[in-house]
């Protein structure tokens, strides 16, 4: 079974993907972690790397190609990626978009990254603007168009476990458990 989870920063992508990975006993891969890792190796923050990626398509292309190879080569995988749902929906059994209002996401990011909510809002706005411009320019993808997703969930008032349970219910209803290759 191949599952793609997309959504804006702070929507709960990583938390939900990790829970699903554990409950389904399948591999989890995060484009966000690869991107953060690259920023760390370059000794810059993620906002700065996003800015660099606006002028250098090779940065996004490298990460997206790695994700493409993974989803093609794995029978069972959960891919967590901002743009994965648009790029790889035809290769997945289930594509999911998680969303939440800016203030909710800012609280989550502030808590995770130990920054103020105001700083989190600034970072989120910068990252989202960068993502939207890059993905439109490089791929012709409007990240406001959610029509490619099988499932869209507002995570505002849900715990990650609740979101995972909703997704597991959809998997069960779609009979995707039989798609698991062991």
UniProtKB/Swiss-Prot annotation:
GO cellular component: cytoplasm
A Pfam family of this chain: Cytidylate_kin2
Classification lineage: Archaea, Thermoproteota, Thermoprotei, Sulfolobales, Sulfolobaceae
Gene3D superfamilies assigned to the protein according to its UniProt record, in alphabetical order: P-loop containing nucleotide triphosphate hydrolases (3.40.50.300)
Catalytic activity: CMP + ATP = CDP + ADP; dCMP + ATP = dCDP + ADP
EC assignment: 2.7.4.25
Keyword Glycoprotein applies: no
Main subcellular location of this protein, as a coarse class: cytoplasm
GO BP, sorted A to Z: pyrimidine nucleotide metabolic process
Presence of the UniProt keyword Kinase in the record: yes
Binding-site residues, ATP: 7-15
HAMAP family: Cytidyl_kinase_type2
Signal peptide coordinates: none
Record-given protein name: Cytidylate kinase
GO terms, molecular function: ATP binding; CMP kinase activity; dCMP kinase activity
Domain of life, per lineage: Archaea
């Amino acid at each position: 079974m191949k599952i793609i989870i997309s959504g804006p920063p702070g929507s709960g992508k990583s938390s939900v993907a990790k829970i699903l990975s554990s409950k389904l006993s399948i591999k989890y891969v995060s484009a966000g972690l690869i991107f953060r890792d690259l920023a760390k190796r370059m000794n810059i923050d993620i906002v700065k790397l996003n800015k660099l990626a606006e002028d250098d398509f090779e940065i996004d292309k490298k990460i997206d190609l790695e994700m493409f190879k993974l989803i093609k080569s794995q029978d069972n995988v959960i891919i967590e990626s901002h743009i994965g749902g648009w790029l790889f929906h035809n290769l997945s059994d289930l594509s999911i978009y998680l969303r939440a209002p800016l203030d909710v996401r800012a609280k989550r990011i502030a808590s995770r990254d130990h920054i103020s909510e105001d700083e989190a809002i600034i970072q989120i706005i910068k990252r989202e603007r960068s993502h939207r411009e890059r993905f439109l320019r490089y791929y012709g993808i409007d990240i406001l168009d959610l029509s490619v997703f099988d499932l869209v969930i507002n995570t505002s008032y849900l715990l990650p476990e609740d979101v995972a349970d909703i997704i597991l219910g959809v998997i069960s209803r779609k009979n995707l458990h039989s798609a698991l290759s062991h």
